[in-house]
Amino acid sequence: MTANVCLDESVRPRLLDDFIGQDELRANMRVYLDAARERGQAMDHVLFYGNPGLGKTTLAQIMAGELGVNLVSTSGPVLERSGDLAAILTNLGRHDLLFVDEIHRMPIAVEEVLYPAMEDFKLDLVIGQGPGARTVKIDVEPFTLVGATTRIGLLSSPLRDRFGIISRLEYYTPADLARIVARTARIIGANLTEEGAIEIGRRARGTPRIANRLLRRVRDFATVHAGGVISADLASEALGRMEVDESGLDQMDRKLLEVLIEHYGGGPVGIKTLAVACAEEVRTIEDIYEPYLIQCGFLKRTPRGRVATAKAYRHLNLLG
């Protein structure tokens, strides 16, 4: 396990009350958790969706902790065969949580095993082959499936409709991100001023994972150049040297906009063409870069392709 992974785990909140941001989702989740505990039943199946780094995995861990049950984690691409999932389901304890990250990448054959398990807590297994094959129903303990996806549109309707709770995670406000990095700084022993937290928070692309990563790198600059103190000026200088601008755009964000404007007149241009021009994968652009650029008003997605906005021209000091 790497040092960064250990650090990430150490700063994850363990309780729902310690989770910062996503106020409406958090308030609703408190009701769902308390109701499940009160009734002594497995919580209804939950689907979290939203961009990477917003806290889907953390929320699954919090749910298990709050309910006092085990959390079994896997991911869609790992579940290659229906038997893989069946083995996991039959080993779950009563009311345990099964967390499936990237659930949209689960094969259809595996997905179909989930249907009776989610609805009736039963597995339909085929024993044998050919004319002698027969279907056997096996009971599994009542459990809660927690799915996480960055691309809810790729989930099949039958699977999506079996989730009783579907919650979207939004980008975080700069104020919430400042609180998150301040909390992380206390845990890891970083000397972060209130102004330094605000500076990091407003450049973190609305994403806690990025905010904590920037804090670690800014702390390096503070250790070498500022006696360990992370002030607003130090944070601004460090982030500038890392090519993270005041809007949170990094080198790749700006390259994407510059290619769109300078090579294609601001668009519209197809995503595949744009990906080739930027030497980047289509999925990476769609999942990592586009959502934030659209959220900030630098990019528009149209039926004819991607278009740079007037705000993008102004941000890059280019004439539109």
Swiss-Prot record:
InterPro entries: AAA+_ATPase, AAA_lid_4, DNA_helicase_Holl-junc_RuvB, P-loop_NTPase, RuvB-like_N, RuvB_C, WH-like_DNA-bd_sf, WH_DNA-bd_sf. SUPFAM superfamilies: P-loop containing nucleoside triphosphate hydrolases, Winged helix' DNA-binding domain. Residues 246-320 are annotated as: Head domain (RuvB-H). This is Holliday junction branch migration complex subunit RuvB. DNA binds at R301, R306. The RuvA-RuvB-RuvC complex processes Holliday junction (HJ) DNA during genetic recombination and DNA repair, while the RuvA-RuvB complex plays an important role in the rescue of blocked DNA replication forks via replication fork reversal (RFR). RuvA specifically binds to HJ cruciform DNA, conferring on it an open structure. The RuvB hexamer acts as an ATP-dependent pump, pulling dsDNA into and through the RuvAB complex. RuvB forms 2 homohexamers on either side of HJ DNA bound by 1 or 2 RuvA tetramers; 4 subunits per hexamer contact DNA at a time. It comes from Nitratidesulfovibrio vulgaris (strain ATCC 29579 / DSM 644 / CCUG 34227 / NCIMB 8303 / VKM B-1760 / Hildenborough) (Desulfovibrio vulgaris). Belongs to the RuvB family. One of its GO terms (molecular function) is four-way junction DNA binding. SMART domains: AAA (SM00382). Homohexamer. Forms an RuvA(8)-RuvB(12)-Holliday junction (HJ) complex. HJ DNA is sandwiched between 2 RuvA tetramers; dsDNA enters through RuvA and exits via RuvB. An RuvB hexamer assembles on each DNA strand where it exits the tetramer. Each RuvB hexamer is contacted by two RuvA subunits (via domain III) on 2 adjacent RuvB subunits; this complex drives branch migration. In the full resolvosome a probable DNA-RuvA(4)-RuvB(12)-RuvC(2) complex forms which resolves the HJ. It catalyses: ATP + H2O = ADP + phosphate + H(+). One of its GO terms (cellular component) is cytoplasm. HAMAP family: DNA_HJ_migration_RuvB. Keywords: ATP-binding, Cytoplasm, DNA damage, DNA recombination, DNA repair, DNA-binding, Hydrolase, Nucleotide-binding. Its EC number is 3.6.4.-. One of its GO terms (biological process) is DNA repair. Residues 173-243 are annotated as: Small ATPAse domain (RuvB-S). ATP binds at R12, G53, K56, T57, T58, E119, D120, F121, R162, Y172, R209. Mg(2+) binds at T57. Has 3 domains, the large (RuvB-L) and small ATPase (RuvB-S) domains and the C-terminal head (RuvB-H) domain. The head domain binds DNA, while the ATPase domains jointly bind ATP, ADP or are empty depending on the state of the subunit in the translocation cycle. During a single DNA translocation step the structure of each domain remains the same, but their relative positions change. The lineage of its organism: Bacteria, Pseudomonadati, Thermodesulfobacteriota, Desulfovibrionia, Desulfovibrionales. Residues 1-172 are annotated as: Large ATPase domain (RuvB-L). It is found in: Cytoplasm.
